[in-house]
């Protein structure tokens, strides 16, 4: 509480007010420096006029005033530089304060979450998850092995079928040839030739 019953300003509000006052002071100094530059040019012009008129004593006094004026301008420039540095420092302090507040909020949130987390239950959940994952992997491996066995059996059946056909063809070719006239029907010769061609094609595909 302040002396007048108002609420006390927070550090953020005080920093904001300080920065506003510093900016106001810099603007006022800029205006004063611009005014003194005009006065400086007037002094230089008067000194030249007095020197041309031979009024050296007056020119000397005016030159002394010019030196003092320039000294005042230099001091104002130095003060302005200081104000600028203070303003920058204030901005840095405000940024650091904002970052500190954010870190404090994050720390508080993390602390709350840690308090609410049941480590024992979390460990049980992770163990159950790992167990179920292993079961799924084992099932996938078993299914893959079954598919591989089926493919192997199918390929073996194909090879065996081709070998049997080859043996049958070989035995057929070793049989003594029979004259056409000894066959009861001439259509049997055509049938044997067709089967012979199909067997040859099958053997070539092996």
Swiss-Prot record:
Bias kind Basic and acidic residues: ranges: 9-32
GO biological process, one term: protein transport
One CC-aspect GO term: multivesicular body
Record Pfam families: Snf7
Organism domain of life: Eukaryota
Subcellular location field: Endosome membrane
Spans annotated as Disordered: 1-32
Entry-linked InterPro entries: Snf7_fam
Entry membrane topology: Peripheral membrane protein
Location (main, coarse): membrane
Coiled-coil region(s): 12-80, 114-148
Keywords noted in UniProt: Coiled coil, Endosome, Membrane, Protein transport, Transport
Disulphide bond pairs: none
Function: Probable core component of the endosomal sorting required for transport complex III (ESCRT-III) which is involved in multivesicular bodies (MVBs) formation and sorting of endosomal cargo proteins into MVBs. MVBs contain intraluminal vesicles (ILVs) that are generated by invagination and scission from the limiting membrane of the endosome and are delivered to lysosomes enabling degradation of membrane proteins.
Family assignment from sequence similarity: Belongs to the SNF7 family.
Subunit structure: Probable core component of the endosomal sorting required for transport complex III (ESCRT-III). ESCRT-III components are thought to multimerize to form a flat lattice on the perimeter membrane of the endosome.
Name of this chain's protein: Charged multivesicular body protein 2a homolog 1
Organism the protein comes from: Dictyostelium discoideum
Organism phylogeny: Eukaryota, Amoebozoa, Evosea, Eumycetozoa, Dictyostelia
This protein's encoding gene: chmp2a1
